[in-house]
Swiss-Prot record:
GO molecular function terms listed in the Swiss-Prot or TrEMBL record: beta-agarase activity
Function: Cleaves the beta-1,4-linkages between beta-D-galactose and alpha-L-3,6-anhydro-galactose residues in agarose. Cleaves agarose in a random manner with retention of the anomeric-bond configuration, producing beta-anomers that give rise progressively to alpha-anomers when mutarotation takes place.
Active site positions, chain numbering: 167, 172
Other comment: Gut bacteria supply the human body with energy from dietary polysaccharides through glycosidases that are absent in the human genome. Beta-agarases, which are active on agarose from marine red algae of the genus Porphyra, are present in marine bacteria. They are absent from metagenome data of gut bacteria, except from the genome of the gut bacterium B.plebeius isolated from Japanese individuals.
UniProt cross-references to PROSITE patterns, sorted A to Z: GH16_2 (PS51762)
Residue span(s) of domain GH16: 27-315
Name of the featured protein: Beta-agarase
Reaction(s) catalysed by this chain's protein: Hydrolysis of (1->4)-beta-D-galactosidic linkages in agarose, giving the tetramer as the predominant product
Length: 316
């Protein structure tokens, strides 16, 4: 018992030291103030899960710096929404970027893809996924500086509770031109989900604001952009794009109108997940990347320059 207590205390001390060292360093993102208002008497403090990806992590051996913060897979054994098949060796870090690529080898297995009434057998699509070693909870601000892949696949930065029932999407977007009707490279999906797993139910907002499009006609794949969410409390989410507040949702009627949480709202600790997905609902419509498209590795690589996480602490 004493040994277990010592181990817990040591881990807590190491985490505290890491947090202190983190806040004493300078980072690329320092030129961008946190756009969300901390509130009276509170200040933003950088969280150790933040990562500038200024190190090397090879696909086969990612090294200590990567594994100190990330697992190179999903947060359980699920391999992704069919026909997605997440592979550890499709994730790397180099040139200052997290890189998640996609491919389809000749011997890739067929996957049964189901979306609503539609079922197809399609060749799998290999890609990558990483999950944070540390979970976060409101009030927290999470922001990524990323460049979408030029692909029909989804480029994603999101948060998910360990039981897969509460989800906040920071970036979910499709950079390719084959958009399949209104979900193209000029849109960012700024949304959340609340699930009941048995029997399966899924709520997410359906308002037009959840598919954000700016008034400049920006194609989000063309450059890096900062996209962040301030998870303020169980019933308030604020979304920021390049430092500008573009969407706020607040209240039970839009967070959880069906009472799937039993009235609590978004309260569960969440893992941070970064990945690519060949999503089922698009794949059954013919929007999987083709073998020919996948030969262009650059187009099918999601780049993340950095991700930063801030929590609120009392002002000293």
């Amino acid at each position: 018992m004493k040994r277990k207590l010592f181990t817990i205390c040591l881990a807590s001390l190491q985490f505290a030291c890491a947090a202190e060292n983190l806040n004493n360093k300078s980072y690329e993102w320092d030129i961008y103030p946190v756009p969300a208002n901390a509130g009276d008497g509170m200040v933003w403090k950088l969280h150790p899960q933040s990562d500038d990806f200024n190190y090397i992590a090879d696909e086969k051996d990612k090294g200590k710096e990567f594994y100190a913060k990330w697992t190179d897979f999903y947060h359980n054994h699920w391999t992704g929404p069919a026909p997605t098949i997440w592979q550890r060796d499709h994730v790397s870090v180099s040139d200052g970027f997290l890189k998640i690529r996609a491919s389809r080898p000749e011997d890739v297995p067929l996957k049964k893809v189901v979306s609503g009434p539609n079922t197809k057998e399609l060749p799998g699509t290999y890609t990558g996924c990483i999950t944070s070693k540390t979970r976060v909870k409101y009030p927290v601000y999470v922001e990524a500086y990323a460049k979408l892949s030029n692909s029909t696949m989804a480029s994603d930065v999101w948060m998910l509770s360990p039981d897969d029932t509460q989800e906040i999407d920071i970036i979910e977007a499709y950079g390719g031109d084959r958009d399949g009707g209104g979900y193209g490279a000029d849109r960012l999906h700024l949304s959340h989900h609340i699930f009941i797993r048995q029997p399966f139910k899924d709520y997410q907002p359906k308002d037009s604001g959840s598919w954000y499009k700016d008034d400049k006609g920006t194609l989000w794949r063309d450059d890096f952009h900062r996209v962040g969410v301030f998870w303020k409390d169980p019933f308030t989410l604020e979304y920021y794009v390049d430092g500008e507040l573009v969407r706020t949702i607040s209240g039970k009627d839009i967070i959880d109108p069906n009472n799937y949480t039993g009235g609590t709202g978004l309260v569960k600790d969440m893992d941070i997940i970064i990945n690519m997905e060949d999503q089922s609902w698009r794949a059954v419509k013919g929007l999987s990347p083709t073998d020919e498209e996948l030969k262009n590795v650059e187009d099918h690589t999601f780049l993340v320059d950095w991700i930063r996480v801030y929590t609120l602490v009392p002002e000293e």
